[in-house]
């Protein structure tokens, strides 16, 4: 089974760009690494805004399928995690009075989240440092995105999950992660760049 690396943060915090950079930096070290971008982005693009908590089941299953497709690699990088649908489900409901069905769905998602947490070897949180620009897919504005950031952190802390906050430019963030993974040795540069990484990501997705 691969070492699983999850890069987490709210919408438009730079996590997808970071996994592209990290993927490149690991490939040029001749590491057997696979990457998958979050399933929910494709879901939102194809089906529109999520309106019901039950849709988080589909997000969970889609993300699980993506992550299982990386089992052949030594390292598996994602910018999401299968426990995040629970966080979003809880966030969607907010403080409103919950129906019996909503409570049961939230319980199911929580059980799945707790079951899946141990499979991640490294969890990194990416704080919002570069401002917020809408991408035409996600519905959240910056204020909501910041609230999602807090919801993710609250979950990690409430469940005593070990995670590392990664700051700096995209390149600096990637280098810090490599150091934590003990992969920061000097290497001979190869002709691989972020454009190539983006093409590989498109092929894999």
Which residues make up each language-model segment?
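Hydrophobic anchor at the beta1->P-loop junction of P-loop NTPases
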Residues: 7
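Conserved substrate/cofactor phosphate-moiety recognition/catalytic segment
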Residues: 23-65
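Conserved nucleotide-sensing/catalytic segment adjacent to the nucleotide-binding pocket
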Residues: 48-97
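A glycine- and Lys/Arg-enriched "phosphate-lid" helix/loop adjacent to the NTP-binding pocket
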Residues: 92-171, 176, 196
């Amino acid at each position: 089974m691969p070492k699983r690396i999850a890069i987490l943060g709210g919408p438009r915090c730079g996590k997808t760009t970071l996994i592209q950079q990290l993927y490149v930096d690991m490939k040029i070290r001749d590491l057997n690494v696979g990457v998958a971008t979050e399933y929910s982005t494709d879901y939102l693009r194809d089906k529109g805004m999520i309106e019901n908590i039950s849709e988080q089941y589909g997000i969970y299953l889609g993300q699980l399928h993506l992550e299982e497709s990386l089992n052949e690699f030594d390292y598996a990088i994602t910018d999401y995690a299968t426990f995040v649908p629970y966080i979003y489900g809880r966030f969607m409901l907010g403080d409103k009075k919950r129906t019996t069905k909503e409570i049961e769905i939230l319980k199911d998602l929580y059980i799945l989240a707790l079951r899946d947490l141990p499979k991640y070897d490294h969890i990194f949180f990416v704080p919002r440092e570069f401002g917020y620009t809408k991408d035409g897919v996600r519905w959240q504005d910056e204020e909501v995105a910041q609230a999602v950031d807090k919801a993710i952190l609250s979950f990690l802390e409430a469940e005593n999950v070990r995670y590392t906050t990664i700051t700096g430019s995209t390149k600096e963030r990637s280098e810090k992660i490599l150091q934590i993974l003990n992969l920061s040795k000097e290497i001979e540069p190869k002709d691989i760049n972020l454009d190539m990484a983006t093409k590989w990501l498109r092929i894999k997705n």
